[in-house]
Amino acid sequence: MPRKTAENVETIPVGPLGIIAMPGCEALCDKIDKYLVKWRANQASEHQQNIAFYGYQRDTYKVNVSLPRFGSGEAKGVVNESVRGFDLYIITDVFNYSCTYNMYGMEVPMSPDDHYADLKRVISAISGKAKRITILMPMLYEGRQHKRSSRESLDCALALQELVNLGVDNIMTFDAHDKRVQNAIPNGSFENIMPTYQMIKSLAVSYTHLRAHETLMNL
């Protein structure tokens, strides 16, 4: 029997892919969606009739959600299409203060607490119908409040526990302030991705004078 390698092992999708863009992440999700549509369109189409690959190739993977707000500033999450059995990825930037909403006639910038509350609203609106939910949070909510040094709240630990209790399967973040905060959810999946190489590569591309070996060594 021939040995199986990474080249000939096929992975069956968990479910139809769905991408949810939270406020402030629309442009990023558009780029991700366009890349996935193009990449999957170029894949072999031999499994198109296989029920396990249902929804593998689509025109878009974005899921239409809305977060209407009342005049009091209160909001609700609405999922405008079925996500039953989907493999959902929710992308949120909780530190994006360029997002605003109207409260009592005033434009108010969204705080990390507002972004986090919206995230929970969308998860609640999904109502447990998705096959798997993954949260992609580039900067971890309350990541700097990762330990207690006096009579303090453990906000990051509480947030992680809340998300897991709401049915989130995976939480992904970049360069967490202290990755040991994952101890708050020992049975949950917490991925701390280090973007060091990508940052150096981006700097070298954007600032050509940094490409010289001697210059890089002096950084």
Q: At which residue positions do the language-model features occur?
A:
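PRPP-associated nucleotide enzymes
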Residues: 1-214
